[in-house]
Amino acid sequence: MSLCTVEINLSTIKNNYLLLQDICKTSLVGAAVKANGYGLGAVQISKALIEENCRHFFVASSEEGVNLRNALGLDVNILVLNGVFEHDALELIEYNLTPVLNNLKQIEIWQKFSNLKNRLLPCYLHFNTGINRLGLSSDEIEQLINDRDLLKGLDLQYIISHLAISEEIDNPYNLEQLNRFKAYLQYFPNVKASLANSGGIFLGQDYHFDLARPGAALYGLNPLTKNPVTLKAPIIHLQNLTLDSHIGYNMTFTTKRDSVIATLPLGYADGFSRNFSNQGEVFINSRSVPIVGRVSMDLINIDVTDLPPSEIFLGQEAEIIGNYCTPDKIASIIGTIGYEVLTNLGSRYKRKYIG
């Protein structure tokens, strides 16, 4: 077991959810808990959000859906964003998972199993309005409009789409996607709709429709929501080095003075990127401490020379993620996004849930 601890504040996640629900007013708000709840624990987060009346949970795959269903029981809706495939259709039916159908082939597969089971099978349809990743194309949507038998045997519960650049509020592409979505929905007047991801919630009520699907904002990856995550690591080694001493693999850092160097037990095997070598920072008692030398598989070194001697000791905790170094701030150092920082949190870390 790692000496490092990831602390997840479920109360903060619940408060973020309630903030988003308040913004959405009359629309339902679900939760994206794919990738194990963005690395924070899909089961624990979902159970906490159920307490706030969340009933729609979005996962990527059938495997994620089965794990969540086993933990949550039948009283929630679990939606599988990657859709249905021949190999997992029966599993989706057995575990009451609802696929988001992304192309005509998936519709055909789901119809086939509807006939096999001789009953309606629930589904969402995903219309591609411009992200050009998953979703039915304009040609496929036109086929559905002109031939409703293509949906025979299916209980179509929602039509969804996904915004490509919702975090840029003034980007005109958001409105382009909204208008395309509305144009398609005219042909399905009795079907509920969902468009807003986290960023979409903040674009205004026109984007909310019947159901919003936040992920990032629940986990503090938005200026208006709070970070629920703290990652701490203890000092496990201390050494006094003289001027011109080399630190770590490839000797990429050389001391410019007599220095006190501390070692922390985490590295790239724990999802702490090697790109933080010689440019990241951690915090000890609110003071910034630089990472020096290469990030290695299991260890990083930090320069604690400028800390008061009373704060430099074995077992002293350094904050890697927290109030002083949020996932978004850390991500900006190495040119990535906070999502990647969270989903990369290693399995060796101890998880502690509070709130």
From Swiss-Prot:
Keywords: Isomerase, Pyridoxal phosphate. GO terms for cellular component: cytosol. Its EC number is 5.1.1.1. Substrate binds at R133, M297. It catalyses: L-alanine = D-alanine. Pfam families: Ala_racemase_C (PF00842), Ala_racemase_N (PF01168). It comes from the Bacteria. This is Alanine racemase. It comes from Rickettsia conorii (strain ATCC VR-613 / Malish 7).
